[in-house]
Amino acid sequence: MSGGLLKALRSDSYVELSQYRDQHFRGDNEEQEKLLKKSCTLYVGNLSFYTTEEQIYELFSKSGDIKKIIMGLDKMKKTACGFCFVEYYSRADAENAMRYINGTRLDDRIIRTDWDAGFKEGRQYGRGRSGGQVRDEYRQDYDAGRGGYGKLAQNQ
C-alpha cells in the first residue's frame, strides 16, 4: 500500500470537507471543523419537495446502517422543503455516502451531500423568511420539484 493511501486511511477523514460552514453554528470555526471531521451526519440538499423519507432511506442505506433521517420542513406549513439530514452509526458509512451518493440523481434531481456538525432540534426547519429554504426565496426560474417559482417571483 502506498504511503499516501495509508496516511489517508489513518486521517480523521479522507473525504474532504467543503468550504461551507453553517452560519448559525453556536461556537467558533475551529470547534465546528473538529465536529465536522468526526461527524456521522450528512446534510442532503437539492431534494424535490416530493421526495419521501422512504426514498432517502432506500438510497442512503446502500452506504451503511442509518441511525436516523430528519426531513427538512417548511417552518410555517410543516411540509417538506428540499433537504434532510442523514445520520449513520459510523463515520465510515457516512464517508461512503459522501463518496458514492453525492451528485447522484433522486426524483430527477441531482442531490448533493455535505458534512454536518450534528443535528440539533430546530435545524429541521427552513431558514427562509417564508418558512422554506433561503435559496427558494430568490429563485427566478420555475422548478416543479421545488414548489414552482421562487417566493419573491410568486409575489410579483
Swiss-Prot record:
GO terms for molecular function: DNA binding; mRNA binding; RNA 7-methylguanosine cap binding; RNA binding; RNA cap binding; snRNA binding. MRNA binds at Y20, Y43, R112, T113, D114, W115, D116, R123, Q124, Y125, G126, R127, Q133, V134. GO terms for biological process: alternative mRNA splicing, via spliceosome; cap-dependent translational initiation; histone mRNA metabolic process; miRNA-mediated post-transcriptional gene silencing; mRNA 3'-end processing; mRNA cis splicing, via spliceosome; mRNA export from nucleus; mRNA metabolic process. Keywords: Acetylation, Cytoplasm, Methylation, mRNA processing, mRNA splicing, mRNA transport, Nonsense-mediated mRNA decay, Nucleus, Phosphoprotein, RNA-binding, RNA-mediated gene silencing, Translation regulation, Transport. The modification Phosphoserine is found at S13, S18. The keyword Cytoplasm applies. The keyword Cytoplasm applies. The modification N-acetylserine is found at S2. Changing F83A: Abolishes mRNA cap-binding. InterPro entries: NCBP2 (IPR027157), NCBP2_RRM (IPR034148), Nucleotide-bd_a/b_plait_sf (IPR012677), RBD_domain_sf (IPR035979), RRM_dom (IPR000504). Changing R112 to A/T: Does not affect mRNA cap-binding. Changing Y138A: Does not affect mRNA cap-binding. Changing Y43F: Does not affect mRNA cap-binding. The modification Omega-N-methylarginine is found at R146. Changing F25A: Does not affect mRNA cap-binding. It is found in: Nucleus; Cytoplasm. Pfam families: RRM_1. Residues 40-118 form the RRM domain. GO terms for cellular component: ciliary basal body; cytoplasm; cytosol; nuclear cap binding complex; nucleoplasm; nucleus; RNA cap binding complex. Residues 134-144 have a biased composition (Basic and acidic residues). Component of the nuclear cap-binding complex (CBC), a heterodimer composed of NCBP1/CBP80 and NCBP2/CBP20 that interacts with m7GpppG-capped RNA. Found in a U snRNA export complex with PHAX/RNUXA, NCBP1/CBP80, NCBP2/CBP20, RAN, XPO1 and m7G-capped RNA. Interacts with PHAX/RNUXA, EIF4G1, HNRNPF, HNRNPH1 and ALYREF/THOC4/ALY. Interacts with SRRT/ARS2 and KPNA3. Component of the cap-binding complex (CBC), which binds co-transcriptionally to the 5' cap of pre-mRNAs and is involved in various processes such as pre-mRNA splicing, translation regulation, nonsense-mediated mRNA decay, RNA-mediated gene silencing (RNAi) by microRNAs (miRNAs) and mRNA export. The CBC complex is involved in mRNA export from the nucleus via its interaction with ALYREF/THOC4/ALY, leading to the recruitment of the mRNA export machinery to the 5' end of mRNA and to mRNA export in a 5' to 3' direction through the nuclear pore. Belongs to the RRM NCBP2 family. This is Nuclear cap-binding protein subunit 2. The gene is NCBP2.
